[in-house]
């Protein structure tokens, strides 16, 4: 496959006609003087990196609860890895690397403590008030909750970064406004009333690069963490077509290599294989459709940045393997049950008595209607790190589940 790529990924070629041009950005909700030294998308990336929400990702879980070890991935390390892959794919496709990086870095801002376990628990608790969705929460953080600037709430990111954050996995509605996968979260609908995010159209090419980079990163690095935890073995991976084929090649080339380095070599080669497959497949898609502008990508009616059919099938098989042997492993499930209980307990306490929350969060909630109170509690809870949630539970309860 590398021969098909030539120097495609080296960044020597000019920006494509279908790329998102920062000079033509649709701007920000609140007008600002543009920087003389950075493009709008570079400013977005920098604002994301300097935000409090970005730093909190350091202590938020991917698969393994952060308490379990210092070398497992967190939302922060995952986001950095996604950003690196997104830049590589965007560079090869001649898109705007900075926009792809910005979307990648911000895409996990709305995740709760304890990964998807925490999100499921909070979504259940919020069922009567519209539920909880981490993409909608990411939007709330960067448009309302992050308090850094004198003239506006949030980060005042460009339209293109917000569009990518909300729609990196595809359109949310049909042309009539009906949700494609159920009701669209109210936070997204409300913001789109102020700055139309065109929820019925696809995102630009750069957001699509970030989305597939997310898939590549977690499909590969969850294997790495699973091997480190002893829940997966190299012999188990032999039964899965993509890592199995790569592992065979590594062992043939390095027959005396120890298992740790063999695992790292497997991860490195798997990322390379998936990235190169995406570049070739996306290039073919773009040549077939022939978009001549960023808006033409949005109106194309399909995702352009995709795996080949063969790689998509291999990725589906790998996801099924990880779900069965890692995400549903009895040890992971035991810890998740405790984490779920922590989130549920905290929500119940804060909702029943907002005075249990810090001053900045509880103000005015004693007289607020339940809908507003519940959303404020969800905002506070979703912003917690794993470590802070554990600390709060120990402060408020006599007994806290053991997550070790």
UniProtKB/Swiss-Prot annotation:
Segments crossing the lipid bilayer: none
Gene Ontology molecular function: any one: dGTPase activity
Keywords: Hydrolase
Biological processes, Gene Ontology terms: dGTP catabolic process
Pfam families: HD (PF01966), HD_assoc (PF13286)
Sequence ranges assigned to domain HD in this UniProt record: 75-219
Signal sequence range: none
InterPro entries with a match to the protein in the record: dGTPase, dGTPase-like, dNTPase_2, HD/PDEase_dom, HD_domain, PHydrolase_assoc_dom
SMART domains to which the protein is assigned, alphabetical: HDc
UniProt-listed NCBIfam families: dGTP_triPase (TIGR01353), PRK01286.1-1 (NF002326), PRK01286.1-3 (NF002328)
Family (UniProt): Belongs to the dGTPase family. Type 2 subfamily.
Name of the protein in question: Deoxyguanosinetriphosphate triphosphohydrolase-like protein 1
């Amino acid at each position: 496959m590398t021969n098909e790529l030539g120097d495609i990924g080296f960044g020597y070629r000019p920006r494509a006609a279908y790329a998102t041009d920062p000079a033509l950005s649709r701007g920000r909700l609140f007008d600002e003087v543009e920087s003389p030294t950075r493009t709008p998308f570079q400013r977005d990336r920098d604002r994301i990196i300097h935000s409090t929400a970005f730093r909190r990702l350091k202590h938020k879980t991917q698969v393994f609860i952060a308490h379990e070890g210092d070398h497992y991935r967190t939302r922060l390390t995952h986001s950095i890895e996604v950003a690196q892959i997104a830049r590589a794919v965007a560079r090869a496709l001649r898109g705007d690397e900075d926009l792809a990086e910005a979307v990648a870095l911000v895409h996990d801002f709305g995740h709760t403590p304890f990964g998807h376990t925490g999100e499921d628990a909070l979504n259940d608790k919020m069922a009567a008030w519209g539920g909880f969705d981490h993409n909608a929460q990411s939007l709330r953080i960067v448009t309302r909750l992050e308090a850094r600037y004198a003239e506006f709430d949030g980060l005042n990111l460009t339209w293109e970064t917000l569009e990518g954050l909300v729609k990196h996995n595809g359109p949310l509605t049909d042309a009539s406004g009906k949700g494609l996968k159920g009701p669209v979260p109210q936070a997204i609908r409300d913001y789109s009333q102020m700055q139309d995010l065109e929820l019925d159209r696809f995102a630009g090419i750069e957001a699509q690069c970030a989305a597939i980079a997310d898939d590549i990163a977690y499909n590969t690095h969850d294997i790495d963490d699973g091997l480190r935890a002893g829940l997966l073995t190299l012999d188990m991976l032999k039964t899965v077509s993509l890592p199995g084929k790569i592992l065979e090649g590594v062992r043939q080339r390095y027959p005396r290599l120890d298992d740790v380095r063999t695992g790292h070599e497997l991860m490195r080669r798997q990322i390379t294989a998936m990235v190169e497959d995406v570049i070739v497949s996306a290039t073919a898609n773009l040549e077939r459709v022939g978009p001549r502008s960023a808006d033409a990508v949005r109106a194309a009616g399909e995702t352009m940045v995709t795996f080949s059919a063969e790689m998509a099938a291999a990725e589906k098989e790998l996801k099924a393997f990880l779900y069965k042997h890692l995400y549903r492993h009895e040890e992971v499930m035991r810890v998740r049950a405790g984490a779920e209980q922590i989130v549920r307990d905290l929500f119940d306490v804060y909702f029943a008595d907002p005075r249990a929350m810090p001053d900045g969060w509880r103000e005015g909630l004693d007289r607020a209607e339940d809908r507003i109170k519940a959303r404020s509690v969800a905002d506070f809870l979703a912003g917690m790190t794993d470590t802070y949630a554990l600390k709060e539970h120990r402060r408020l309860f006599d007994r806290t589940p053991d997550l070790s």
